[in-house]
């Protein structure tokens, strides 16, 4: 069953069909993160995520939206500051994880994205931000979110990763962070395709372009294989289907990982199909008993229609009781019910943001 809908992102661009043919052999690995301080780092052991000392790590984090859309729209890389003071504000909320959305075209430097915001410049900005998060004791999750097949531009999140470019992105992302054992990588955010197609790839429900043409997708098994061949040995996060809201097929359709370092991800919002404790007990709990599970996106309502805390408190309290991590949507100053903050000094925005801040403080 599909979720009730998707969030309305702050800035979705219009689709542009380019005549330029694209040829990408892979992105440069310049600026790769050093692993000298993270020789072991985060690793999966059974259904727990552990740090280098063997202590359990449970994410209580936020999403930092902007890196998926600012670059493709041609006005920046981040939406808001990426400074030390802005990260310290996150740390003051006791955030220990930040999910960073990745734009495929911007990372690879393809499809006529402005050079100032793409390719080496984009990758360097992401790497520097990851280092800044590390210095503040925060674990980054890097998640491919906006992508597009062929010469289409990656102006929104489509139904599945594309066979044309996503494998090159996975290879480059994995190579860039292969020495950093304090990150987790997610090859995709939200999918609309069925569980078989999401695992194996192929032409299925995913479409793109003004005529909604089907395209060849790349599957999660290919993602894991590509990342491991690129020498990334850390955790890989695999989302569920139906906009990551349905994990009922996750255990039967998880990729094979020779390193046994897979985590599961669900996206849970108020008004989603799966947004009740009974659904969590039925579909999330069995997964959480087998592998580490995070709510990679979660909020009061998927459409930003409610600024309260009745839903998010239910979600996070259930997660706390089941050892499940979470990353709230979103650490941005959008001035609506999706926003956690009213400024990048960390002032909470509305009851939603205030509840999250208080809850994270209580977890200490």
Listing of model-derived features with the role each one plays in the protein:
Residues 41, 79, 96, 103, ...:
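Extracellular glycoside hydrolase catalytic/binding regions
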Residues 25-32, 235-237:
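Signal peptide processing junction and immediate N-terminal pro/mature segment
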Residues 31-97, 354-362:
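N-terminal carbohydrate-binding accessory modules
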Residues 69-73, 84-177, 181-193:
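Substrate-binding cleft and catalytic face of glycoside hydrolase catalytic domains
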Residues 12-25:
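Bacterial N-terminal signal peptides
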Residues 19, 87, 130, 224, ...:
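Short glycine-/small-residue-rich flexible loop motifs, especially phosphate/cofactor-binding loops
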């Amino acid at each position: 069953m599909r979720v009730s809908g998707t969030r309305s992102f702050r800035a979705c661009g219009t689709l542009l069909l380019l005549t330029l043919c694209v040829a990408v052999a892979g992105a440069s690995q310049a600026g790769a993160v050093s692993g000298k301080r993270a020789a072991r780092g985060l690793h999966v052991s059974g259904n727990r995520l552990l740090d280098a000392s063997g202590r359990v790590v449970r994410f209580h984090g936020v999403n930092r939206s902007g890196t998926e859309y600012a670059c493709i729209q041609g006005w920046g890389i981040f939406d808001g500051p990426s400074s030390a003071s802005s990260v310290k504000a996150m740390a003051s909320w006791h955030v220990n994880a930040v999910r960073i959305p990745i734009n495929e075209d911007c990372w690879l430097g393809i499809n006529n994205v402005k050079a100032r915001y793409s390719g080496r410049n984009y990758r360097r900005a992401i790497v520097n931000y990851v280092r800044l998060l590390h210095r503040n004791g925060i674990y980054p999750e890097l998640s491919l979110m906006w992508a597009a097949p062929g010469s289409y531009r990656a102006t929104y999140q489509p139904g599945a990763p594309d066979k044309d470019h996503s494998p090159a992105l996975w290879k480059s992302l994995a190579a860039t962070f292969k020495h950093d054992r304090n990150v987790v990588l997610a090859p995709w955010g939200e999918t609309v395709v069925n569980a078989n197609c999401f695992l194996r790839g192929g032409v299925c429900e995913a479409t793109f372009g003004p005529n909604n043409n089907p395209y060849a997708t790349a599957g999660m098994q290919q993602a894991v294989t590509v990342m491991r061949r690129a020498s990334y040995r850390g955790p890989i996060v695999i989302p569920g289907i139906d906009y990551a809201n349905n994990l009922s097929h996750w255990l039967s359709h998880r990729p094979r990982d020779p390193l046994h370092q897979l985590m599961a991800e669900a996206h849970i919002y108020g008004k989603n199909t799966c947004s009740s404790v009974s659904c969590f007990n039925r579909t999330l709990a069995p997964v959480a008993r087998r592998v580490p599970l995070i709510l990679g996106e979660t909020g009061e309502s998927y459409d930003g229609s409610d600024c309260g805390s009745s839903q998010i408190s239910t979600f996070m309290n259930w997660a706390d009781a089941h050892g499940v991590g979470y990353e709230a949507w979103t650490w941005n100053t959008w001035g609506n019910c999706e926003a956690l903050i009213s400024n990048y000094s960390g002032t909470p925005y509305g009851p939603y943001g205030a509840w999250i801040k208080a809850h994270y403080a209580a977890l200490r």
